[in-house]
Amino acid sequence: MSTTTKIIQTTDIPKIKGGLPFLGHMIPFAKNPFIFMKKVSDQAGEVAQFKIFNQRMILLTGNDASKLFYRSSDEQLDQSAAYKLMTPIFGKGIVFDAPIQKKNEQLKMLMPALRMNAMRQHSGKIITEVEDMISDWGDSGEINLVEAMKQLTINTATHCLLGKEFRYELTNEFSDIYRDLEKGVNAIAYSFPNLPIPSFRKRDKARVRLHELVHKIIEKREASNDKHTDMFQMLIDTRYKDGTQLSSNDIAGMLVAAIFAGHHTSSGTSAWVLLELLKNPFHMKEVTQELDSLLGSDGNVTFQNLRETPKLENTLKEVLRLHPPLIVLMRQVAEDLLFKNHQIKKGDMVWASPPVTHRMAHLFRNPEVFDPDRYTPGREEDKNLMAYQPFGGGKHKCSGNAFAMFQIKSIYSILLRKYTFEFVDTPDTYVDDYGEMIVQPKSPCRIRYKRRTADTFISKYGTAGDQQEASSQCPAAPSTKAQPATTTTEATTNPTFYISIDKQLCQGHAMCAGESPELFNVSNNVATATVASPSVSMLEKAQCAANHCPNAAIKITTDHSSK
């Protein structure tokens, strides 16, 4: 009996012309990474190859190619090998420098501070930081918006995530340390992270100093009887699965990783929210009216009532589509892959580019137009998770995405009710600065502000925030106890629905368990449905949980076959 082997004919991946000996396409990439990759995608399509130094790069853009990038396993596409530039920042053996299992274990340690219950506690801290920032603004004036947002978001991130020592005792020094670390992420670092250049020397000195500070704080806390509930203390108390305690170097690296997750995606985005609203007065009016109606002139801002701001949220989503903070995401190919008869070889570096995919007309209608309504019911252009990817995708999606969204919404729930704003310079001068790998608007980014008066409010509820906290919650379930799985008899008289959870997307934010503890449980950073087929009376609660999942990992269906 003979057997036959099917031979798959492969075709070459389209090559980008040009490039210099040894350097390849490094010069145009370093000059403007976004423009370079947009041209690559426009010329070659969803998969293209080029070289940076002697490394073959494969750019994957669009829906299908992005699915390969975000859905492949770690055994196929190695995230850690692609991010060696982060080792001098996080430290040896931390996150991307750790074996896969240890890296995943470390990232799970950070999740409790980014979950729903923690964020309920964060709201007051964020509001305090915003009010501190504007306390000396007076009735009118001018600011550099980019610098103001950089300082505000580092203050909120340290206050919420690191603890009082970093926020109140080391404020200026930690800000300087963080900025030196952040400047170590640039185009050169992707290929040569250890070159003896000034920015890398500053980065390395900052990392050493951070370790020293962390070690001193640990010693101080161990000698004190004070009780701490912040992420810092959580890491001090946490153990690896084998019982090993985290070293001070481990903790320093983990804290920086947490700040990168909760800050670097939000400072530039925070600035762009205001800039885009100023460029689009109609949407500015809608967002301001929404906040006025919900909170009045002095209503309290809470985690719950900020969920009732769809216009602000859709504005933020659209800002993230047009101005995603990361230009490129990377993986190293660990085993040969086939994509539409194109062979991607072991050792290749594959890239995804959110800003390029976000501007594809077949994925987003009129992609260059600022249009927050594209996320409203009936359009929902963010539902395709392989197209809308400001925080990445798959199981490696940025775990700080929910915190970043909440942080920015909190900031503008205060600023837009306190002041009106206007450009100092002509609107077309406010553009992205692609000279950095973490995108910000170009500086100086000058904005003029003026305090609002009571007669400018659309509605005045006073302390409406307190009233809204209760009324804006998802509808209560008929019972606070978990329901048993529906029996066949019940299904006949009481229709059911089905819950499925994409384990690759779920990161354990626990929004679902917070909204519907009757239906969901989170253990070991993975959510599970506690009821196999709930009665339809629980459908509204389940849909609420699905709507608030930051990773869109929950699917509600009425057809068991599609579960």
Annotate each language-model stretch with its function.
Residues 13-38, 42, 56, 83-162, ...:
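Cytochrome P450 catalytic-domain helical core, especially the substrate-recognition surface
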Residues 21, 28, 115-117, 154-155, ...:
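Conserved cytochrome P450 catalytic core segment spanning the I/J/K helices
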Residues 25-45, 212, 216, 300-340, ...:
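Conserved cytochrome P450 K-helix E-x-x-R motif and the immediately C-terminal K′/meander segment
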Residues 153, 157, 210-217, 238-293, ...:
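Central I-helix of cytochrome P450 enzymes
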Residues 256, 303, 342, 355, ...:
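Cytochrome P450 heme-thiolate "Cys pocket" and heme-binding signature region
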Residues 281-283, 403-438:
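Cytochrome P450 heme-binding "Cys pocket" and the immediately downstream C-terminal segment
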Residues 352-380, 458-466, 474:
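Conserved cytochrome P450 K-helix/beta-meander segment immediately N-terminal to the heme-binding cysteine loop
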Residues 511-524, 546-560:
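Iron-sulfur cluster-binding cysteine motifs and their immediate structural context
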